[in-house]
């Protein structure tokens, strides 16, 4: 089947923003203008097309990034048809995993900011993630019709808070109630949208006289920014020659793709103004799959050997599975991004991570929650597959004859746990199936059984994260569950080195006995280094075949530390000496010896309890700053700074132990009459104060 749209006209873009900056509304408008939706879905009345899970529609926030395909020929129909694959990403901090995984498969992003709120805390997290994956981006300042809207203040914040390099390509005409449209700095014309046609019709007019000087000033800045793309353009510019429109667009495009600048636009998605111009900017400035470097991976058998795949239909097939969803009609859907080659439904693909071949069932192109079955997917496209049983998020799918392992995604460790049990015993098995399905979809969600209590423990990125998963269990799987109080994911480590500690497991009472003897040195590692085992046995005092057993004995002991049974992290064990018995030694005896030596060494190495510390940012009206700061301090928080918000008010940044943050949203609401909001994300582990550690140990009964 021939390609309908050349790959140069593909744009794989994400739309991401702080919660409530109007991102889903912006996406809705895009779907409307690109002709996919005939009636605009409003988030206000819970009808938005992209927010397709029931909880999202109730809460008015986006949780799962739905992928949608749309087509655009330009605002005035003056471009050849381009194909947009749009990924809507959530703005709530408990779902950063969703943002992270969509960033990985995008080629460009539109960052939506609120003209009143400006650069809010979550915007900084998203910006950092986009930097990490080197995603070229545009900035769109939304809600220009709101009281307190200020485009230029947001411009300043992008520079100071995000260290961004925004280049406005439009400036607003009016603001708040008086917001009418924008001045297009490329055309040097005013664009006024027709409200009766929901912004489908528009006209170019002369720039209002009172804005001429502002428009000239910002056009000059834009042209200067374009001239910096090459020496040749700079010479032309400094020589007083005019740069052509095509030269400016190409230069800004090159610099955007190199992540040197971010073209900046504005509008009000709700009032249907400005989104259309942003879509043109996506064509003008954001990359197609061929404008970015080829994807790289490694050889299946030799992880040092680097391979690359170009975005070309004739290359060998390679794709990345970036999301799993359970669909009520077709079962498990795996969303994947094709980096090279093409694939037909019914073809066999190879998953080098799982070392399994699988046959691809149906292939679906998604439009929010509607789907269209297609026969083949080409390089640069995003689609969903039915029938892959073994693939999970982050796996590579490739041509069985040309294996490649694309870089895996790194998922954060959960910081909060809760016990969960079904309301009726009959639902126990159903709950197990539901939880495993949800864990397959979301790698930052874990399920385990507590060996001591037999309880099912779920872990995730925050209270809201777990609340929504329990809610989904009820809606999608019909399992109602009770959840216990949130538990903090503490860790244990050591502060000193313990040398020459021995573990001896001996059972000799007639017949075949048991004999294992290991001597270890245990030392602390720097935070985040994890566990390391070094074999320093000389002269065969422990035979080679028993050394892995000693390591296994230690590794099996790591999940349950000696202080309060929490996982032990950041320690290094060196096996230095030991002895064996010709007849009585076996693997089991050495496993026991390793475990005994490790526990004894932990006792001698000054064990300490670590607690998760959270980066907390509170947005509050100025009147409440004292109250909020006092409250954070009472929660053992350390206030690290304060910023001004665009529309007045303050952002307070603090580091607070997670254990002190339970129920914070309720107390913040009552302390500020519901006018303050906060976000929180995991920062690092720190040693818990003695009184806290003792309380935790007492609660664990150790």
Curated annotation (Swiss-Prot):
Domain tr-type G: 8-290
InterPro entries listed in its UniProt record: EFG_II (IPR041095), EFG_III (IPR009022), EFG_III/V (IPR035647), EFG_IV (IPR047872), EFG_V (IPR035649), EFG_V-like (IPR000640), EFTu-like_2 (IPR004161), G_TR_CS (IPR031157)
Binding annotation for GTP: 17-24, 88-92, 142-145
Pfam family membership, one: EFG_III
Lineage: superkingdom: Bacteria
Compartment(s) where it occurs, according to its Swiss-Prot or TrEMBL record: Cytoplasm
Keywords: Cytoplasm, Elongation factor, GTP-binding, Nucleotide-binding, Protein biosynthesis
PROSITE patterns: G_TR_1 (PS00301), G_TR_2 (PS51722)
GO cellular component labels: cytoplasm
MF terms (GO), sorted A to Z: GTP binding; GTPase activity; guanosine tetraphosphate binding; translation elongation factor activity
BP-aspect Gene Ontology terms: ribosome disassembly
Function statement: Catalyzes the GTP-dependent ribosomal translocation step during translation elongation. During this step, the ribosome changes from the pre-translocational (PRE) to the post-translocational (POST) state as the newly formed A-site-bound peptidyl-tRNA and P-site-bound deacylated tRNA move to the P and E sites, respectively. Catalyzes the coordinated movement of the two tRNA molecules, the mRNA and conformational changes in the ribosome.
Family designation: Belongs to the TRAFAC class translation factor GTPase superfamily. Classic translation factor GTPase family. EF-G/EF-2 subfamily.
Protein name from the UniProt record: Elongation factor G 1
Organism (species): Cupriavidus pinatubonensis (strain JMP 134 / LMG 1197)
């Amino acid at each position: 089947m021939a390609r309908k749209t050349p790959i140069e006209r593909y744009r794989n873009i994400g739309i991401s923003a702080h919660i409530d900056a109007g991102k889903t509304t912006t996406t809705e408008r895009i779907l409307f203008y690109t002709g996919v939706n005939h009636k605009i879905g409003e988030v206000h009345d819970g009808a938005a097309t992209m927010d397709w899970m029931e909880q999202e529609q109730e809460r008015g926030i986006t949780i799962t990034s739905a992928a949608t395909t749309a087509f655009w020929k330009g605002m005035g129909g003056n471009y050849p048809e381009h194909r947009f694959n749009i990924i809507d990403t959530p703005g709530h901090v408990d779902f950063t995993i969703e943002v992270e995984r969509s960033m990985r498969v995008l080629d460009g992003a539109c960052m939506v900011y609120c003209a009143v709120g400006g650069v809010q805390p979550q915007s900084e997290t998203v910006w950092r993630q986009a930097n990490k994956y080197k995603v070229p981006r545009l900035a769109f300042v939304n809600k220009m019709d709101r009281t307190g809207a200020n485009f230029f203040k947001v411009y300043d914040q992008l520079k100071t808070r995000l260290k961004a390099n925004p280049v406005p390509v439009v400036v607003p005409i009016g603001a708040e109630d008086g917001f009418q449209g924008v001045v297009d700095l490329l055309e040097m014309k005013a664009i006024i949208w027709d409200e009766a046609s929901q912004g489908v019709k528009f006209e170019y007019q002369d720039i209002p006289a009172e804005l001429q000087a502002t428009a000239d000033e910002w056009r000059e800045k834009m042209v200067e920014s374009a001239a910096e793309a090459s020496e040749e353009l700079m010479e032309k510019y400094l020589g007083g020659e005019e740069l052509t429109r095509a030269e400016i667009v190409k230069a800004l495009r090159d610099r955007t793709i190199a992540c040197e600048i971010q073209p900046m636009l504005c509008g009000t998605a709700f009032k249907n103004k400005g989104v259309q111009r942003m879509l043109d900017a996506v064509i003008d400035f954001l990359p197609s799959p061929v404008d970015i470097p080829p994807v790289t991976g490694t050889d299946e058998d030799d992880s040092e050997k680097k391979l690359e795949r170009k975005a070309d239909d004739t290359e060998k097939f390679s794709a990345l599975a970036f999301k799993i969803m359970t669909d009520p009609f077709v079962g498990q859907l795996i969303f994947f991004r094709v980096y090279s080659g093409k694939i037909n439904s019914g073809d066999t693909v190879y998953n080098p991570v799982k070392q399994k071949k699988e046959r691809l069932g149906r292939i679906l192109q998604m439009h929010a929650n509607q789907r269209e079955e297609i026969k083949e997917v080409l390089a640069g496209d995003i689609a969903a597959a039915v029938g892959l049983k073994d693939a999970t998020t982050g796996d590579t799918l490739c041509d069985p004859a040309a294996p490649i392992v694309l870089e895996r995604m790194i998922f954060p460790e959960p910081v909060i746990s809760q016990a969960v049990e079904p309301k009726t015993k009959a639902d126990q098995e159903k709950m197990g199936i539901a939880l495993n399905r949800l864990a397959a979809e979301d790698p930052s969600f874990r399920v385990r059984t507590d060996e001591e209590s037999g309880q099912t423990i779920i872990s995730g990125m925050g209270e809201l994260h777990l609340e929504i998963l329990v809610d989904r269990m009820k809606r999608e799987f019909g399992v109602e569950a009770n959840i216990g109080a949130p538990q903090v994911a503490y860790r244990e480590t050591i502060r000193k080195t313990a040398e020459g500690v021995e573990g001896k497991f001996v059972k000799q009472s007639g017949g075949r006995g048991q004999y294992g003897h290991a001597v270890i040195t245990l030392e602390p590692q720097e935070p985040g280094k994890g566990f390391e085992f070094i074999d320093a046995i000389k002269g065969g005092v422990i035979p080679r075949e028993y050394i892995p057993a000693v390591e296994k004995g230690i590794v099996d002991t790591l999940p349950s530390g000696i202080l309060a049974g929490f996982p032990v992290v950041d320690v290094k064990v060196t096996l230095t000496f030991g002895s064996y018995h010709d007849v009585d030694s076996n693997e089991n005896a050495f496993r026991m010896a390793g475990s005994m030596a490790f526990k004894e060494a932990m006792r001698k190495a000054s064990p300490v309890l670590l607690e998760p510390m959270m980066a907390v940012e509170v947005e509050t009206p100025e009147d409440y700053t004292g109250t909020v700061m006092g409250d954070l301090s009472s929660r053992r928080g350390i206030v690290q700074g304060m910023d001004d918000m665009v529309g007045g008010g303050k952002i307070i940044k603090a580091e607070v132990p997670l254990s002190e943050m339970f129920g914070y949203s309720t107390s913040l609401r009552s302390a500020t009459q519901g006018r303050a909001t906060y976000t929180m994300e995991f920062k690092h582990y720190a040693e818990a104060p003695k009184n806290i550690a003792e309380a935790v140990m007492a609660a664990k009964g150790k």
